[in-house]
Amino acid sequence: MTNGSAPSLYERLGGVYSIATVVDDLIDRVMADPRLNANPLVDEAHHRVPPAGFKYLVTEMVCWATGGPQQYTGRSMRESHEHLKITAAEWEAFLDDFQQTLDKFGVPEAEQDELKAIVASTRGDIVI
């Protein structure tokens, strides 16, 4: 926090270590979700990509998107998801996993709302 300004979402979430802990749980949850793995393209991707690398990139992206000092170095959301042919139902399953993770860690409602808005802004690049 600088010059008396309100803390960023990144700061309110507790910074990189707290964000990484939440992302770790979310990615484990998503990678094991049978609703998502019913899509053979998603299932194959979940078994092709090492979880640690996936978690790193998602942590980097969340930190960047919430106002942290990190820079996201991965591919665009469209480029990294278009070949997976993710449906609206699969998107809803992901959102359910996301909500379960936020609730598990007791993320306050105001911060949840901001995070959900960030996630919602990516839907058009992810869902077919």
Please give the residue ranges for each predicted region.
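Core of compact, soluble alpha-helical bundle domains
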Residues: 1-128
